[in-house]
Structures are given as C-alpha cells and as structure tokens.
Amino acid sequence: CDWSSDVCSSDLLCIAVMPLVKPEWWEKHQAHAVILWSLLFAIPFALFYGAPKAVETVLECLIGDYLTFIVLLFGLFCVAGNIKLEGSLVGNPKVNVIMLAVGTFFSSCIGTTGASMLFVRPIIQMNSWRKNKRHIMVFFIFLVSNIGGCLTPIGDPPLLMGFSRGVSFFWSMRLFPVLVLNMILLLTIFYHLDKKAYQKDITKGLMPEVKENEPLIRIKGAHNFLYIVMIVIAVILSGVLPKLSAFQNAAGEVIGIPIFREVTLTVPAIIEIAIILLAALLSFKTTPKEVRVQNHFTWGAIQEVAVLFIGIFITMQPALMVLKSAGSGLGITKPFEMFWATGALSSFLDNTPTYLVFLTTAGAMHFTTGVATTLGVVPVKMLMAISCGAVFMGANTYIGNAPNFMVKSLSDENGINMPSFFGYMWWSLRSEERRVGK
C-alpha cells in the first residue's frame, strides 16, 4: 500500500500548499484536484486488488462514513445559520474569554460542529471592529471545535463510536479535570495574546461601536434550538439503534439497504439522515430570510468542506487499512504511547476510524480490569489516553476535525486573514509548547 499511502500524503500536501502558491487557481479548481487524487488512488487500487474490491472500498467509504458525516455538518450549518446572536456585547479580552469558555462547554452538549456553527458568527461579529483578530479564531478552533467535545459521546464522533461499542454514556465525564486544566492553560495564553492585540487596535484609533439602549444579548431565530436538539437526538440514535435486536438480522448484523457486495446503507443511518435533513428543512421554512442575510449566510463554507473531505475520506483508506492490518503488531502497549499515536494520526486522518483502530488494539490485549467493551476490556487510563488523543489532537491541523475547516472558511469569508495550513500547525505547536511550559 506504499503507493496509495503516497496518494493520501500528496492529497494532504496539495491542500496545504496550493492555497499558498496558487490561491486563485485553487479556488476555481479544488474540485478537479480532489477528483484527480481520488482517481490516482482508485485506478491503481483497482488494478492491484480488482475492480470489484476497489468499488466496494470507495462505496464503503462514501456510504458508511462520508454520507452521515457530511449530512450532519450540513444540518448543523443550516440550523446555526438561522440563529443570530446580537446585542451590545463587543469583542474585548474578557468578553472573548467568556464566549470561548461557554462555547467550549456547549461542545459536549451539542457537538463540536454544532457549537462551532452556533458561536462562530457571534464571535466574528463582536470582533468585526478589530484588525488583529486571527488569533481569536485559532483559539476558537482549539477550544470550541475540538477539546470541548470530550465530555460526552455527543461531543465528538470518536466517543460516539466508543459508546456504540459498550463504553457507558457518561464514562467520558472522567475527562472533566483534563478538559478544565487545558481550558485554563489555553484561555490564560489567549487572554494575554488578546490583551496585547486589543491594546494595539486601541492605539491605532480603532474603537467599537457603542450600541445604546440595546440589550446585552438578543437572539433571533431562537426556535432553531429545537432543531439542534432534533439533530442531537439523531446522533444519539445512530449509536443506540444498531444495538437493538429490532435493527439486527438473525446473524446479528445491522439491517439496511444492500448497495454493493458487503456495502449496506443501514436503517439507523437512514433514520439519522432523515431527521437531520428534516431539521434543516424546518429551520429554513420557519426562519425569516432576513436572519440569514444579517448572518451573511452563504453556501461557500459547506461546499468547500464537502469537496475537500470527500477526497480526504477516499485517499485515506490505504493508511487506515495498514493500521487495521498492523493492529497489535504496532508495539503500542502503554497509555502515553496510545495517546501520542492516536493523536498524531488523528491530526491528519479522520479521528473516528483512528480511535476505533486503537480501541480495538487495546481491547485485544487481554486486560482483565478496566472498562468492559464489545472489543474487550480496556484499562481506564488507556481509554482516557485514546479518547484525549483522538479528540484533543484533532486541533493540530485544519483537517484534523471537520469544524476546523468550517471555521476557517467562515472566517475567510468575513475578511479575517486566517493562517495557512502550515501556519496554523505552527500556532498549534506553539500553543502546545506554552501549555507544557506552564
């Protein structure tokens, strides 16, 4: 699989480099680039393993993983775009810290994607008067789009996969002290950075608009929170329904619509997709268009994510196949090794299958004490390490977690000059150094 792993690496490198060297070309032709890299994987794969196996692998990726992934992003993007937070709040270091902290805790309630889409526009609007603000969105990605999702299976898809394999729903609340420690460190770093940037803006004569007779916060489209709850319920059902006998055949397999060979669109997935799309439709039908206009709502961000991630999902299959086949032969047996291995791979591959690979590896080590899962008993510290690695390290790159790229795209749309792919990685590494330094 060396050649196909090279395709995945080249695809990621293309995403990283092309916006820097040929930004206009990339904006026009990113879909063509994704098709090219996908074909460079699919054609040699078909020649080596046979066309049926290649078709099955691509369809399994698209039907089994990508479809529910992009529908969830689409639903939350639509519903959050119909909610507008406004009022007299203006962006300053204290207000920004409070908003980031609240958004971080919201991530475990409505998911990192839901919280990101809900809070990103208010944060951008509150700080629209400022010039030095890219750091605000970088730390938004660190906190709201990633580490905040570690407390419940709703928060991040890897934990949902753990829940569907026997980890109790509230088990990840054990990560609360880890979350709080990281929040304190990150928000402290952020406050000092934002205070310096804020003072620079004030020195340059930039001043926020003072809104008299305005409430502190006013919410337009508040009824859309009901649709967010619908989407959260759909996500929970996707983890619960496959365990029920009513959704299993005699062999214990989840029932569904056969697509090709072993590829099946399961009934729980269909139910999840239907609920999410219904929530998005109702959101648009029941919310005045003026709310979306005031939010500067466009389809650009979700289109960009949909195009780029379909290529990433397809071309990352060889790397995941290597991981699955290697499994316990990787020689990773200690919690800290699990943390760094899961985290490093989750930075560039989808963190959900990466989490499952290492959870399966840990479950096959024949431990006798720990958390009982359908994959075997996993020691508490090892499960904590795998969970933190998958959830936290998704913040290391724009492609480590889907909300990262969504936030970047929306920030770019609103005139915030976000760091490049490698520039963002530098931010994440510097932040890690500062946390360790404290």
Go through the PLM ranges and name each one.
Residues S4-S5, W25-V34, V55-L67, F169-V178, ...:
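Interfacial loop-to-helix junctions that mark the boundaries of transmembrane helices
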Residues L186-E253:
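Long, contiguous bundles of hydrophobic transmembrane helices that form the permeation core
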Residues L20-E24, A42-D65, F74-G91, F105-L118, ...:
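Transmembrane alpha-helix boundary signature
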Residues C61-L72, W171-I189, I259-L277, W340-A344, ...:
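Alpha-helical transmembrane segments
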Residues P44-A46, S107, L118-N132, I136-V138, ...:
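Membrane-interfacial helix-loop connectors
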Residues I228-V357, T361-A364:
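Transmembrane helical segments that form the transport core of multi-pass membrane transport proteins
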Residues C1-W3, V7-S9, G437:
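Short, small-residue-biased leader/transition segments that mark boundaries at the very start
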Residues N132, L151-T152, F170-L216, F392-K438:
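Juxtamembrane and boundary regions of transmembrane helices in multi-pass small-molecule transporters
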